[in-house]
Each structure stands twice: as C-alpha cells, then as structure tokens.
Curated annotation (Swiss-Prot):
Family to which the UniProt record says this protein belongs: Belongs to the WEB family.
Coiled coil: 95-141, 188-219, 344-375
Lineage of source species: Eukaryota, Viridiplantae, Streptophyta, Embryophyta, Tracheophyta
Keyword Nucleotide-binding in record: no
Pfam families found in the cross-reference section: WEMBL (PF05701)
Keywords, alphabetical: Coiled coil
Name of this chain's protein: WEB family protein At2g40480
Signal sequence interval, chain numbering: none
UniProt keyword Nuclease, yes or no: no
Segments of this protein annotated with the region Disordered: 303-337
Biased composition (Basic and acidic residues): 328-337
Taxonomic superkingdom: Eukaryota
Amino acid sequence: MALAEEQHQNYHVAEAIPGTPGIHDVRIQPGSENSGFCVDPVGVSNVPGIRRVGLRAEIDTSPPFGSVQEAVTRFGGRGYWVPFKLDDTFNGEFDIKRMEEHAAELEKDLIVKELETLDVLEALGSTKRIVEDLKRQLQQEALRCSDQLSSDIKEMNDEHCHHNPMSSPDLILMELKQAKMNLGKTMDNLVVIQSSVESLNKKMKEEKDFLEKTRAKLTYGFGGPVSLAEELSRIKVKPQVQDEPLREQVKMVAEADETGLNLQNKNSLRTAEMRLVAARKMEEAAKAAEALAIAEITMLSSNGESQDDDSEFCFPEPPRSPVTPRGLRIDNDFSTDKSSRRGILKKLEEATEGVKQSKQALEAALNRVEIANVKQLAAENAFRGWTKDSLKGDNFTPLNHTRRSFFSHLNKHHEPLDILPKPVLKSNISMRDVLRRKQVPKEDVVAPQRQSLEGQIPRRNVNLSQMLKELKQDVKFSARGEKEEVHEEKQYVTQRRKFGFIHITLPLQKQSKKKSSL
C-alpha cells in the first residue's frame, strides 16, 4: 500500500501541466544532509532550471518540451484553426436554412431588377418610336416647305440632284430653318393661349371674391339668432330661485326658434345666390347680344361705305335684259338691308328686355333682403325688451299667470307653455293684487291676460283707476264656457253689484234658494 501511494504521488508530480513553473515543497527530513539551514542565496540553485523561493519553495523553470511535435501530441494531436469563436447555440442546420432564405431573397431581388430593366427597355423602345415619328414629321414638314419654295430654287435643286443624287446640305439647312420657324409660331401661339388662360383665371378669382363678399353681407344681414344668443349669454342677472324653471323654458324655446330661423336663413341665402347667378348670366347674355348687334351694324355700315366707294369707279354697264331690270335689283338690295336692320333692332330690343328683367330680379332680391333685415331687427328689439321686463323681478306673480314663448308665431310646432310650475307668492303684496284676487274670478282674469300676452308685452305698473276701468270693459260672463267645463270644474255664478260708481263682479258658489224656487 505504501508503495502504491508513493507511485501515485510521483505520477502526480510528473503529470504537471507543461509550460507552467512547477512549485515543490521542500521538507527537511531528519538525518538527511539538508537538515541544516540553506546556505545558498535566494534565487540561486545548483540544479539548472530550478529557482529557489524562500527557504522551502522551489520553482521549476526548465523547458517543458523538446520540440513542437511533442507539445502537439501532449495536447491531443493536430487540429484546424478556427478564425472566430462561434456562439454556444450554433447549429449547422440553422445556418443552412438561413443561407437558403438569403438565396431566396437574392433571387427575388434579381427578379425585381430584371422587371425594372424590362420596363426601362420598353420605355426606351417607346422613346425611340416617338423620336422616329418626330423625325418623320420633320421630314414631312420639310417637304411641305420645300414645295412652297420658289421655282428658281427648285430648278437649282433639280440640277444639283442630277449631279448628286444624295440630298445636299443646303436643303437640310433650309428644312431646319423652316422647322425653326414653325416652332417659333407654335411657341407664340402657346404664349397667347397662356396669357388668355391667366386672364380667365383672374376673372374667375374676381368673381369668387365678389361671391364671398355677397355671402358675407347676407350672413351679416341674417345673423340675428347668433347675436341674440350672444346677448342672452352676456346678460348677468341676480340669482332668483323662483324664476329658474321659467328661464330654462325660455332658453329651450329660444334655441328651438333659433334653429328654425337658421333653416329659413339658409334657404333664403340659397335662393338669393341662385337669383344672383341667374341675373349675372342674363346680363352676360345681354352684353353678348349687344356686342353682336353692334358688330353687325358696323359690318353693314362698312358694306354700305364700300358700296358707295365702289360706285365711284366707272364700270361698263351690262346689257339690260327684260327679265332682270336694274330697278328690281335695287329694290331687292333695299329690302334685304331693311330686313337685316329689323332683325338687328329686334335683337337689341330682346337684349334690353333681358337686362331689364335681370335688373328687376336683382331689385326684388335686394328688397326681400332689406325686408328680412327689418323684420330681424324688430324681432331683436322686441326680444330684448321682453327679456329686460321678464328679468327685472316683480314682487308678485298672480295665480294662473301663464307665460308663452315669444317666437310662437315663427315656430308653430311648439306647444304653449301653459303647463309650467307656478311660482310661489311672496310676502309683500300690493293693494291692486289683493283687489283683483278678491273681486274678480279666475276665468275673468285669465282671458284678458292671455290676450294681452299674445298681442303685446304685459304691463307691470298700472294704477288703481286704470285697473278698475279695465274691469268695467273686459269682465264678461260666458255661459257657453261654463256649459263645456261642467265635468271638470265647479260652476261660478257672477252677480253684478254697485258700489258707488264702480261695477264689480262677485263670485257666488251656491245659488240662493229663492232664485232656485223662482
């Protein structure tokens, strides 16, 4: 066992990694020669390739191998050099797939490039054809120009052609000059066309600006509801708890009326625009007719003057024949002149009538716009006064006092606001209100109030004498209304009594027995 352990230790010592210094632990054994202290200096040793470190350590620095082949065989034999370090997840199959995908992409790119080259070739072929066509056209134009040349030049060219069958450079230069002349003419025509197009564009812009101005004027004229809404939003009133539901109802009705007015304004704007366009077209047609008539008149006058000028020359008179005498010819010419003048006068009259009609249509449209503006201003003023009176806040609002929308005459689809929450009575009540409550029944009070609300704005400050006069004039008893409302309400019988100079109706719920017996 001891021998095996010694061999194993020796094997481990011999099997140290070559190329690295071997460190040995030197232990002093008793009875050996080296039992004493080491006299050699540190770093110096008798054995070559061994270096001492301290008293107990030695480092082996001798060459590990005698040749390169020994080192190769020691480390596992020969192998190929790898230029770069691959990843741990490297796999040959994955690399093949990747290369295949790359090859497929390259093929696709090649196909795309081939298609592009084909398109380029087709474009080149088309350009070549166009160039050939242009050359043919130039040759044809040159031939046409050569036909228009003088006879002397043609003879010279023919003689030169007899001598030289090939085309001469003079001919080519002439053709080129003619082509340049034609190009210059076409360029001039293009410039004229461009100038006309620019002038037309300017006219169109002017017409558009005019239309925008008219639209702005019309919208400013019909901008009533928007201004009313803005004024309502600007009004600031102290908070009143009792008038909140009424304000909400008024706002809802005002919004609905504004929508109706907006629709009416849009329709009126469209009709006005259509009329303006029609009037402009009529004016243009009238101007064109006038221009044509003036041109015809000038032509006829110029023809007459030319005939007068021609009459100054002396031509030999043709032989007279019994079939076409000279007088008949003069009469025919005079009749044709008269008919042409009559036609021109008719055209002028028609043009003037068209202009008058267009002016009348424009005046009617302007009058309608003015009427609409006046109505709008009146509605705004009335609505402002109504809002001021309604938002002042009275001390008392009578029972069964109903409010109706101011725009009920404009928007008929809305129902009257008779089913509204009634406001609560306040503590301070005037003498006028007390007398009205005690002396006048409900039916007699509500009817004149509704009439006054429908006709005009309700009056707030009324004297006692005025109230009594109104009671004398307006209080009436309607028997038919009582018969119709028997199943809903109790019957109230009014009896007229005299208190001095005042006639007051007092309601009596029960009839006296004496009257019933009678």
